[in-house]
Amino acid sequence: MHCGPPDMVCETKIVATEDHEALPGAKKDALLAAAGAMWPPLPAAPGPAAAPPPAAGPQPHGGTGGAGPPEGRGVCIREFRAAEQEAARRIFYDGILERIPNTAFRGLRQHPRTQLLYALLAALCFAVTRSLLLTCLVPAGLLALRYYYSRKVILAYLECALHTDMADIEQYYMKPPGSCFWVAVLDGNVVGIVAARAHEEDNTVELLRMSVDSRFRGKGIAKALGRRVLEFAMLHNYSAVVLGTTAVKVAAHKLYESLGFRHMGASDHYVLPGMTLSLAERLFFQVRYHRYRLQLREE
């Protein structure tokens, strides 16, 4: 298994909240006005004196909601700092681990051919054994194998990521021009992350590594992180923002669509870094890779 580092590209890096003054006045005003028109700001959190008592009832989930942070305190989206390396890695690691059961069980619904194959295996078991008990155990065994191989592949992917770009975020995202890494901070704690990397060959920016701590989802943090990448791309004068995801949850796809991304297609033949492509792995692990694009301007 070989895990190569991601290619880095060259472009002047401008961080949205800190480098606006480096632009000429007219251009700065025009770009920020365009950004504000496309992505209106999140509702301002009320001050402590005006905050009403919390209402009883269920809280939203999924990372795309517009509710304010707990107790009305604001979330700050800013550049990554070297001291936050472990916190960022933890959020990334925990977020990817959640995909093990999602890929093993929920993801099966995206692969009708695999479902048919498993049904044929169960039918074959009954034809050979004439035992209803053994036949009923076949689906449970197949799901157990799906979980095992999903865990195996995703842990191998994490091993690759944690030894390439996530091994040294400062080196991979903060030092090279044309890339950046942001964190969402609440009460001094990192609760979300996102990265951007430019591709000079087609004048696009790729959105990467977006993840929010599971305890703070449903508060609009993921959307705020996504907007920061879009503003970064606009200020750099890139033509589009692109991303790829293997997420199974519908909420993740709704988040991208709410930011203005268009679904450009999906592939069932994507090879996740860390895969060995063994026969058993192909039989019990499948992932669908979705591509999204947000066109900012025509070339």
Swiss-Prot record:
One of its GO terms (cellular component) is mitochondrion. Aminooxyacetic acid (AOAA) blocks its activity in both cytoplasm and mitochondria. Residues 60-70 have a biased composition (Gly residues). Pfam families: Acetyltransf_1 (PF00583). The chain crosses the membrane at residues 118-138. Expressed in brain, including in mesencephalic dopaminergic neurons of the substantia nigra and ventral tegmental area and oligodendrocytes. Expressed in cortical pyramidal neurons and granule cells of the hippocampus (at protein level). InterPro entries: Acyl_CoA_acyltransferase, GNAT_dom, NAT_camello-type. SUPFAM superfamilies: Acyl-CoA N-acyltransferases (Nat). It is a single-pass type I membrane protein; Single-pass membrane protein. It is found in: Cytoplasm; Microsome membrane; Mitochondrion membrane; Endoplasmic reticulum membrane. Residues 44-70 are annotated as: Disordered. It catalyses: L-aspartate + acetyl-CoA = N-acetyl-L-aspartate + CoA + H(+). Its main location: cytoplasm. Catalyzes the synthesis of N-acetylaspartate acid (NAA) from L-aspartate and acetyl-CoA. Promotes dopamine uptake by regulating TNF-alpha expression. Attenuates methamphetamine-induced inhibition of dopamine uptake. This is N-acetylaspartate synthetase. It comes from Rattus norvegicus. The gene is Nat8l.
